[in-house]
Design a protein with these regions (language model features):
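Short coil-to-beta-strand transition motifs
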Residues: 3-4
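A short beta-strand-turn-helix
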Residues: 15-20
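Conserved AdoMet/S-adenosylmethionine-binding subsite of the radical SAM
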Residues: 84-205
Length: 205
Protein backbone atom coordinates (compact mmCIF):
# COMPACT_ATOMS: atom_id res chain seq x y z
CA UNK A 1 0.00 0.00 0.00
CA UNK A 2 1.30 3.43 -0.89
CA UNK A 3 1.66 6.41 1.43
CA UNK A 4 -1.95 7.54 1.94
CA UNK A 5 -1.07 11.03 0.64
CA UNK A 6 0.38 9.58 -2.57
CA UNK A 7 -1.00 6.82 -4.77
CA UNK A 8 0.44 4.84 -7.73
CA UNK A 9 -1.37 6.08 -10.81
CA UNK A 10 -1.51 4.37 -14.20
CA UNK A 11 -3.33 7.22 -15.91
CA UNK A 12 -5.89 9.98 -15.56
CA UNK A 13 -8.12 11.04 -18.43
CA UNK A 14 -11.38 12.79 -19.27
CA UNK A 15 -13.67 10.73 -21.49
CA UNK A 16 -17.09 9.08 -21.48
CA UNK A 17 -18.08 6.32 -19.12
CA UNK A 18 -18.32 3.34 -21.44
CA UNK A 19 -20.03 0.74 -19.25
CA UNK A 20 -22.84 0.19 -16.82
CA UNK A 21 -25.61 2.40 -15.50
CA UNK A 22 -23.81 5.67 -16.25
CA UNK A 23 -22.61 4.74 -19.75
CA UNK A 24 -22.43 7.67 -22.15
CA UNK A 25 -21.83 10.35 -19.51
CA UNK A 26 -18.79 12.62 -19.32
CA UNK A 27 -16.39 11.48 -16.59
CA UNK A 28 -12.87 11.99 -15.25
CA UNK A 29 -11.05 8.71 -14.62
CA UNK A 30 -8.33 8.03 -12.07
CA UNK A 31 -6.84 4.60 -12.76
CA UNK A 32 -4.80 3.38 -9.79
CA UNK A 33 -2.10 0.74 -10.11
CA UNK A 34 -2.01 -2.56 -8.29
CA UNK A 35 -4.25 -5.62 -8.60
CA UNK A 36 -3.91 -9.16 -7.25
CA UNK A 37 -7.28 -10.41 -8.53
CA UNK A 38 -5.78 -11.51 -11.86
CA UNK A 39 -8.74 -11.89 -14.22
CA UNK A 40 -7.60 -13.70 -17.40
CA UNK A 41 -9.75 -11.46 -19.63
CA UNK A 42 -8.61 -8.17 -18.03
CA UNK A 43 -8.00 -5.43 -20.62
CA UNK A 44 -5.80 -3.37 -18.27
CA UNK A 45 -3.21 -5.94 -17.18
CA UNK A 46 -0.57 -3.22 -17.35
CA UNK A 47 -2.19 -1.82 -14.20
CA UNK A 48 -1.58 -4.96 -12.11
CA UNK A 49 1.91 -4.17 -10.74
CA UNK A 50 1.94 -1.09 -8.53
CA UNK A 51 5.68 -0.86 -9.01
CA UNK A 52 6.69 1.01 -12.11
CA UNK A 53 3.78 3.42 -11.96
CA UNK A 54 4.55 6.85 -10.51
CA UNK A 55 3.10 7.78 -7.15
CA UNK A 56 1.24 11.06 -7.38
CA UNK A 57 0.09 13.38 -4.58
CA UNK A 58 -3.62 13.06 -3.94
CA UNK A 59 -4.06 16.84 -4.04
CA UNK A 60 -2.63 16.88 -7.57
CA UNK A 61 -5.21 14.26 -8.59
CA UNK A 62 -7.97 16.38 -7.06
CA UNK A 63 -6.71 19.45 -8.92
CA UNK A 64 -6.77 17.48 -12.19
CA UNK A 65 -10.34 16.42 -11.43
CA UNK A 66 -11.31 20.05 -10.89
CA UNK A 67 -9.87 20.98 -14.29
CA UNK A 68 -11.91 18.15 -15.83
CA UNK A 69 -15.02 19.41 -14.01
CA UNK A 70 -14.52 22.83 -15.57
CA UNK A 71 -14.21 21.08 -18.95
CA UNK A 72 -17.53 19.26 -18.55
CA UNK A 73 -16.91 16.09 -16.51
CA UNK A 74 -19.99 15.21 -14.48
CA UNK A 75 -18.37 12.77 -12.04
CA UNK A 76 -15.05 11.17 -11.06
CA UNK A 77 -14.43 7.43 -11.50
CA UNK A 78 -11.77 5.78 -9.34
CA UNK A 79 -10.83 2.53 -11.01
CA UNK A 80 -7.84 0.24 -11.49
CA UNK A 81 -6.29 -2.15 -11.07
CA UNK A 82 -8.12 -2.78 -7.87
CA UNK A 83 -8.45 0.62 -6.21
CA UNK A 84 -9.44 -0.77 -2.81
CA UNK A 85 -5.98 -2.29 -2.44
CA UNK A 86 -5.27 1.28 -1.26
CA UNK A 87 -6.77 3.41 1.50
CA UNK A 88 -9.00 5.75 -0.50
CA UNK A 89 -10.21 7.91 2.38
CA UNK A 90 -7.56 10.65 1.94
CA UNK A 91 -8.15 10.75 -1.82
CA UNK A 92 -11.92 11.07 -1.55
CA UNK A 93 -11.56 13.74 1.13
CA UNK A 94 -9.27 15.74 -1.16
CA UNK A 95 -11.61 15.28 -4.13
CA UNK A 96 -14.58 16.43 -2.05
CA UNK A 97 -12.69 19.51 -0.84
CA UNK A 98 -11.12 20.57 -4.14
CA UNK A 99 -13.42 19.23 -6.83
CA UNK A 100 -16.93 18.63 -5.53
CA UNK A 101 -18.00 16.20 -8.27
CA UNK A 102 -19.84 12.98 -7.39
CA UNK A 103 -17.37 10.15 -6.75
CA UNK A 104 -17.78 6.72 -8.35
CA UNK A 105 -15.84 3.56 -7.49
CA UNK A 106 -15.26 0.51 -9.69
CA UNK A 107 -14.14 -2.50 -7.64
CA UNK A 108 -14.11 -6.28 -7.50
CA UNK A 109 -14.94 -6.05 -3.79
CA UNK A 110 -12.11 -8.22 -2.46
CA UNK A 111 -10.88 -5.55 0.00
CA UNK A 112 -12.64 -3.56 2.73
CA UNK A 113 -14.38 -0.42 1.59
CA UNK A 114 -12.53 2.83 2.25
CA UNK A 115 -13.42 6.37 1.24
CA UNK A 116 -16.74 8.10 0.61
CA UNK A 117 -18.54 7.36 -2.65
CA UNK A 118 -21.78 8.44 -4.27
CA UNK A 119 -21.89 5.40 -6.56
CA UNK A 120 -20.22 2.00 -6.20
CA UNK A 121 -20.02 -0.41 -9.11
CA UNK A 122 -19.21 -3.92 -7.91
CA UNK A 123 -17.86 -6.30 -10.54
CA UNK A 124 -17.31 -9.56 -8.62
CA UNK A 125 -15.19 -12.45 -9.86
CA UNK A 126 -15.91 -16.16 -9.38
CA UNK A 127 -12.30 -16.97 -8.50
CA UNK A 128 -12.13 -14.15 -5.89
CA UNK A 129 -15.59 -13.62 -4.39
CA UNK A 130 -16.35 -10.18 -2.95
CA UNK A 131 -16.80 -9.18 0.66
CA UNK A 132 -20.35 -9.09 1.97
CA UNK A 133 -20.04 -5.41 2.91
CA UNK A 134 -19.44 -4.52 -0.75
CA UNK A 135 -22.39 -6.60 -1.91
CA UNK A 136 -24.61 -4.63 0.44
CA UNK A 137 -23.00 -1.23 -0.22
CA UNK A 138 -22.92 -1.33 -4.02
CA UNK A 139 -25.37 0.63 -6.14
CA UNK A 140 -24.63 -1.42 -9.25
CA UNK A 141 -23.75 -5.11 -9.64
CA UNK A 142 -22.05 -5.78 -12.97
CA UNK A 143 -21.04 -9.34 -13.85
CA UNK A 144 -18.94 -10.19 -16.90
CA UNK A 145 -20.32 -13.21 -18.76
CA UNK A 146 -18.20 -15.71 -20.66
CA UNK A 147 -20.12 -18.91 -19.95
CA UNK A 148 -23.21 -20.35 -18.21
CA UNK A 149 -21.41 -20.56 -14.87
CA UNK A 150 -21.23 -16.76 -14.87
CA UNK A 151 -25.02 -16.51 -15.11
CA UNK A 152 -25.36 -18.73 -12.02
CA UNK A 153 -22.71 -16.68 -10.24
CA UNK A 154 -24.50 -13.45 -11.11
CA UNK A 155 -27.76 -14.75 -9.64
CA UNK A 156 -25.98 -15.82 -6.45
CA UNK A 157 -24.33 -12.42 -6.08
CA UNK A 158 -27.59 -10.56 -6.77
CA UNK A 159 -29.34 -12.50 -4.00
CA UNK A 160 -26.91 -10.93 -1.50
CA UNK A 161 -27.40 -7.35 -2.71
CA UNK A 162 -30.03 -4.83 -1.68
CA UNK A 163 -33.31 -4.98 -3.57
CA UNK A 164 -32.72 -1.63 -5.31
CA UNK A 165 -29.23 -2.50 -6.56
CA UNK A 166 -28.91 -2.17 -10.35
CA UNK A 167 -28.19 -5.59 -11.89
CA UNK A 168 -26.21 -5.73 -15.13
CA UNK A 169 -24.72 -8.50 -17.25
CA UNK A 170 -21.83 -7.56 -19.49
CA UNK A 171 -20.70 -9.96 -22.22
CA UNK A 172 -16.98 -10.58 -22.26
CA UNK A 173 -15.37 -8.65 -25.10
CA UNK A 174 -15.42 -10.75 -28.29
CA UNK A 175 -17.21 -13.58 -26.45
CA UNK A 176 -20.06 -14.70 -28.69
CA UNK A 177 -21.15 -17.27 -26.10
CA UNK A 178 -21.17 -14.67 -23.34
CA UNK A 179 -23.10 -12.29 -25.55
CA UNK A 180 -25.80 -14.84 -26.36
CA UNK A 181 -26.13 -15.92 -22.73
CA UNK A 182 -26.32 -12.38 -21.38
CA UNK A 183 -28.87 -11.25 -23.95
CA UNK A 184 -31.11 -14.26 -23.37
CA UNK A 185 -30.95 -13.94 -19.58
CA UNK A 186 -31.82 -10.25 -19.67
CA UNK A 187 -34.66 -10.97 -22.11
CA UNK A 188 -36.16 -13.44 -19.63
CA UNK A 189 -35.42 -11.55 -16.39
CA UNK A 190 -36.75 -8.02 -16.20
CA UNK A 191 -34.67 -7.09 -13.16
CA UNK A 192 -31.45 -7.43 -15.18
CA UNK A 193 -30.03 -5.04 -17.78
CA UNK A 194 -27.40 -5.48 -20.48
CA UNK A 195 -24.13 -3.55 -20.23
CA UNK A 196 -21.96 -3.09 -23.31
CA UNK A 197 -18.41 -1.71 -23.52
CA UNK A 198 -19.41 1.21 -25.71
CA UNK A 199 -16.03 2.91 -25.41
CA UNK A 200 -14.44 -0.01 -27.25
CA UNK A 201 -16.99 0.23 -30.04
CA UNK A 202 -16.30 3.95 -30.29
CA UNK A 203 -12.53 3.53 -30.12
CA UNK A 204 -12.12 5.89 -27.15
CA UNK A 205 -10.52 5.42 -23.75
Amino acid sequence: MADSQRLPVVETFHSLQGEGHHAGRSAFFIRLAGCTVGCPWCDTKHSWPAQGHPEQPIDALADAAQIAAEAGASFVVITGGEPLHHDLQPLTQSLDARCGLPLHLETSGVDPLSGRFDWITLSPKRHRPPRQELLQACHELKVVVHGPEDISFAAAMASKCEDDTERLLQPGWESSIGEALAVEHVRQHAQWRLSLQSHKWLGIR
